Swiss-Prot record:
Listed GO CC annotations: cytoplasm
Taxonomic classification: Bacteria, Pseudomonadati, Pseudomonadota, Gammaproteobacteria, Enterobacterales
Protein known as: Regulator of ribonuclease activity B
Disulfide topology: none
Composition-biased stretches (Acidic residues): 119-140
Amino acid sequence: MAFEALLEEQREETRLIIEELLEDGSDPDALYTIEHHLSCNNFDSLEKAAVDAFKLGYEVTEPEELELEDGTTVMCVDILSEGALKAELIDAQVEQLVNLVAKYNVDYDGWGTYFEDPNAQDDDEDDGEAIDEDDNGIRH
């Protein structure tokens, strides 16, 4: 898929995910963990992309093997960030990561997050983390 077509598809998917979460009652003001999914059949390439993402300030999960429907195996990692559930912020991260992984022939497989209950008791309300209104989504 061409670069611009992939980004446009991801922008549409981002808006759909956000819309569905909010329609289901997820807290619009919560701090969300965004999990960007990467995969590759070459571990070394995936590792290089993961290291570059880490250098940009993202958290990176341990690599895992995943068997696909056709029986082939790929290696996967999640690239994590925290922020507001705002399409523009997520779009910026997606574009940054798609550009990054293209250098290593790694697949960007989309992103996801979790429902945030607006009525849940927050055990770590005093942890000092707040949504940064000036965050443009891009990590440095």
